[in-house]
């Protein structure tokens, strides 16, 4: 990788799962993981990439799982949204400790804790080089944080949605269970939907398809992968339309 890389993308939307914040703890938030992620995001900011960020809440709460155990689904989803706000606040703190300006916006009004989501304000902040962390999902139950990430990416005119996962892309089967699973370097939205490959929920993929928003699935734990993508490197799996050139 060159010492002074040129960015390929001006603005991206990065989706992190809540589980990635746990580290080896198994629950909650590992500050060491936050600091590592802040450092990697800081590398992007340092070369002029504008970063929007969405973090899941699965390290703290999973509404869908508890709804199956009897908790009202809407109540559970609202609790899950609050978990994403907690993660967003923790990430903001880590970014600020690394001298990276950041703002948390929430789809649910939380005066005195976060800013309320405002697209025009988010665009201004991104233009000024601040990292904007979008929390509380879409603000509506039954929508995942994957859908929220794609929605926010489309709204703020990101050029690419990046989904960080535990594995280095999308496979034909679960590589943890099936050693013969094959990794795809490229996929179309249609193939993901038809074969239900489980990259994201289908609502998120349909949204990206409708708005021609490319998605790249990559392994966050791989050192330098995030920076490599934004300077044009080939990491993980790219999902796009049939007629779209390499994103």
Swiss-Prot record:
The keyword Cytoplasm applies. Disulfide bonds: none annotated. One of its GO terms (molecular function) is ATP binding. Signal peptide: none annotated. Residues 23-28 are annotated as: Involved in allosteric activation by GTP. Its EC number is 2.7.4.22. Keywords: Allosteric enzyme, ATP-binding, Cytoplasm, Kinase, Nucleotide-binding, Pyrimidine biosynthesis, Transferase. UMP binds at residues 57, 77, 138-145. ATP binds at residues 15-18, 58, 62, 165, 171, 174. GO terms for biological process: 'de novo' CTP biosynthetic process; UDP biosynthetic process. Pfam families: AA_kinase. It catalyses: UMP + ATP = UDP + ADP. GO terms for cellular component: cytosol. Homohexamer. Catalyzes the reversible phosphorylation of UMP to UDP. This is Uridylate kinase. The gene is pyrH.
């Amino acid at each position: 990788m060159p010492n002074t890389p040129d960015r390929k993308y001006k603005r991206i939307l990065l989706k992190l799962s809540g589980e990635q914040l746990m580290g080896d703890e198994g629950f909650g938030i590992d500050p060491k993981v936050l600091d590592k992620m802040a450092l990697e995001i800081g590398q992007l900011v340092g070369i002029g990439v504008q970063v929007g960020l969405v973090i899941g809440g699965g390290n703290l709460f999973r509404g869908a799982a508890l709804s199956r155990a009897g908790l009202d689904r809407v109540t559970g989803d609202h609790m899950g949204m609050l978990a994403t706000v907690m993660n967003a606040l923790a990430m903001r703190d880590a970014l600020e400790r690394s001298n990276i300006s950041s703002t948390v916006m929430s789809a649910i009004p939380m005066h005195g804790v976060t800013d309320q989501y405002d697209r025009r304000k988010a665009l201004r902040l991104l233009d000024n080089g601040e990292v904007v962390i979008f929390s509380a999902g879409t603000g509506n139950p039954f929508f995942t944080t994957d859908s929220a990430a794609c929605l926010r990416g489309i709204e703020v005119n990101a050029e690419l949605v990046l989904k960080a996962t535990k594995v280095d892309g999308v496979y034909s089967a679960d590589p943890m269970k099936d050693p013969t699973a094959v990794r795809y370097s490229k996929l179309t939205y249609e193939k993901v939907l038809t074969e239900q490959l489980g990259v994201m929920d289908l609502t998120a993929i349909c949204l990206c398809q409708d708005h021609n928003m490319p998605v790249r699935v990559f392994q966050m734990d791989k050192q330098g992968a995030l920076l490599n993508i934004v300077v044009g490197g080939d990491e993980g799996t790219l999902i796009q339309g049939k007629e779209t050139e390499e994103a």
